[in-house]
Regions:
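Surface-exposed loop/linker segments characteristic of extracytoplasmic
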Residues: 1-128
């Protein structure tokens, strides 16, 4: 995407820098990183979204999206579905752009969660 804390650029945008001042929503309203949902039955084996290291770049192993509801880890033999999530039964931890770490409930309103993944939508939110 092009409106999150981490953005993908085209070849003609090489060298483009996103600055904190570009986060018009405020750094306390933007998720920078978070735990990722996995299939715990497949840990140590191939999982399509957990088979590369963290340095693999723009890859579905390291990218998660806020346009899908976060979920607790699964044990059904599937992938993590590129969702945020964790083994915690009620929430996952997210690092916000201001440096704070906050728990995010799996029951978070979908619209609010989506807005927390955008740095420049201009929407006022009250993060959890």
């Amino acid at each position: 995407g092009s409106d999150g804390f981490v953005t993908q650029t085209n070849d003609d945008q090489t060298g483009t820098v996103m600055r904190f001042r570009d986060m018009i929503d405020g750094t306390s309203n933007v998720i920078a990183l978070g735990e990722k949902r996995l299939d715990d039955r497949s840990l140590g084996n191939y999982q399509g979204d957990d088979n590369e290291g963290y340095t693999s770049g723009w890859d579905h192993d390291v990218i998660r999206f806020t346009n899908v509801q976060p979920r607790v880890d699964s044990n059904n033999g599937g992938w993590g579905e590129q969702r945020f999530g964790s083994i915690h039964s009620q929430m996952f931890n997210a690092l916000f752009a201001d440096g704070s770490v906050r728990p995010i409930s799996y029951d978070i309103d979908g619209n609010l969660f989506s807005l927390l993944g955008r740095r420049n939508d201009g929407q006022a939110v009250s993060p959890p």
